[in-house]
């Protein structure tokens, strides 16, 4: 079976989340093949259970897997529930990769995160630096569980010849995100807070100083390069999927883009008594650039405007 010409059954775990919905939209708009894409929801299968995972793989019979499912949360939830973040993600990842091997999946691409990189490091970080030191203490439960995917990918390849690899996106945002005020990530959390501040005619309070820097990638851009990785990337080592270092932006500037997009007229107040987390996690996308020379990304102003509009249009049903 050749990977690109034969009909494939591609299982996307975590298919109803932010990245899964981005991939679903991208595939609908661009895929001209006979591939069958299955976007798994958490209600379809409990990936923390080996038995449940096996029976789902038996039913779907995937030839390829994009593994997105994870227990995720924002800074404060990661700090509070380290045991749960570690154990649940270890179980999910172990079950998915074990079933990929058992059911002879041709290729599995898992999703990691830049928070897995060492806290004390040189910048920009690249794919070779993952295991050079401990991650930031604020999310070590989640980060160590995610690092183990890279360890398992190499082990499965060495021992069984499995083609398991991973990508490392920087901070993802876009439609279908989790807009929970304390448990979501920075952009969706700020969009929701701005919406409520406008509704209640209040000022907007932002946790921390607003100084930390991040590289943000729009979920639809990430979807394009995730599918490219599934079709074209042949290495077992992870691949960073990110905008360039020059596109790093402060949380304060992101907040301003959101308030502009939503036409918020109140004051921005930075609550400096709250933790900032890591100051920066600058990632290099040179490896991706070398593989995809015509790399393009949606401008952040446009993508944030689209994300804000999606939340306003879908306020009643959005995850929050």
Swiss-Prot record:
Instruction: State its Enzyme Commission number(s).
Output: 1.1.1.271
The protein in question is named: GDP-L-fucose synthase
Q: For binding substrate, which residues are annotated in this chain's numbering? A: 193, 214, 276
Protein species of origin: Dictyostelium discoideum
Q: Which family does it belong to?
A: Belongs to the NAD(P)-dependent epimerase/dehydratase family. Fucose synthase subfamily.
Q: Which InterPro entries match?
A: Epimerase_deHydtase, GDP_fucose/colitose_synth, NAD(P)-bd_dom_sf
Q: Which UniProt keywords apply?
A: Isomerase, Multifunctional enzyme, NADP, Oxidoreductase
Which reaction(s) are listed as its catalytic activity?
GDP-beta-L-fucose + NADP(+) = GDP-4-dehydro-alpha-D-rhamnose + NADPH + H(+)
